[in-house]
C-alpha cells in the first residue's frame, strides 16, 4: 500500500488516498469495498475504489494537499474532544489577517520537527484561510507538500498570536528566517488531512 502522505500520531484523515495492486479477478469494486470495510477497524473506512494506470503513485503524483485544523470555543465532550481543539476565545479578524502571511514560497526551516529532510525545507502554500462554520473555526491550508509537524507549528504560532503572546511581525521574522521565535506545535487532535488533488 502506498499512501498519499503520512500524518502525525492522533492526526485524522477524511481524504487519505492510497494505491495498491489487487488481483485481476476483482472486477466488482463495490463488493471489494464492502468486504474490506467489514474487516477493517471501526476507525477506518474506505469510501471509494477506482482503477488507475499502472504507473499511478498516490504520493508522487499529488499536486496539492489540503489540511484543516478545527478549533472551538464551545465546551468539548468525551465524544468530540479527540477530534477538535478547545480554546477560550477567538479573534477572527486577527487570525484571518495573520494566516495570509503563510501564502507563497518560504523556507520552512523553523516550522518543522526532526524527521523532515533538513536540506529541502522550501514549500509553497497556495492558499491559507481562516473561517467559521457553525460552532467550529477552521484553519484551511493548501500546499504542494508539507514538512513533519509543519501545519501544527503554523497553527501553534497563529494561536499564540490569537492569545497576544506573539505578533504578526514575529511571524514574518520567523518565516523569513530572521529569528526562531516559536517552537510549540498545536496539539494533534484538531488536524485533518482533508483532500488530495491530482
Which positions does each model-derived feature cover?
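Structured-RNA-binding interfaces characteristic of tRNA pseudouridine synthases
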Residues: 1-198
Amino acid at each position: 500500500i502506498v499512501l498519499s502522505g503520512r500524518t502525525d500520531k492522533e492526526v485524522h484523515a477524511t481524504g487519505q488516498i492510497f494505491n495498491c495492486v489487487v488481483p485481476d479477478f476483482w472486477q466488482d469494486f463495490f463488493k471489494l469495498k464492502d468486504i474490506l470495510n467489514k474487516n477493517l477497524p471501526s476507525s477506518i473506512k474506505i469510501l471509494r475504489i477506482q482503477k488507475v494506470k499502472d504507473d499511478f503513485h498516490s504520493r508522487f503524483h499529488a499536486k496539492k494537499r489540503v489540511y484543516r485544523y478545527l478549533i472551538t470555543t464551545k465546551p468539548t465532550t468525551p465524544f468530540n474532544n479527540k477530534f477538535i481543539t478547545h480554546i477560550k476565545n477567538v479573534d477572527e479578524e486577527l487570525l484571518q489577517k495573520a494566516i495570509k502571511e503563510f501564502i507563497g514560497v518560504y523556507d520552512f526551516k523553523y516550522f518543522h520537527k526532526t524527521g523532515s529532510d533538513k536540506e529541502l525545507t522550501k514549500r509553497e502554500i497556495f492558499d491559507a484561510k481562516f473561517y467559521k462554520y457553525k460552532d467550529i473555526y477552521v484553519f484551511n491550508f493548501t500546499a504542494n507538500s508539507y514538512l513533519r509537524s509543519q501545519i501544527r507549528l503554523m497553527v501553534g504560532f497563529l494561536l499564540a498570536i490569537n492569545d497576544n503572546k506573539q505578533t504578526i511581525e514575529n511571524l514574518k521574522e520567523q518565516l523569513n528566517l530572521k529569528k526562531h521565535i516559536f517552537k510549540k506545535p498545536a496539539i494533534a487532535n484538531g488536524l485533518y488531512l482533508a483532500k488530495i488533488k491530482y
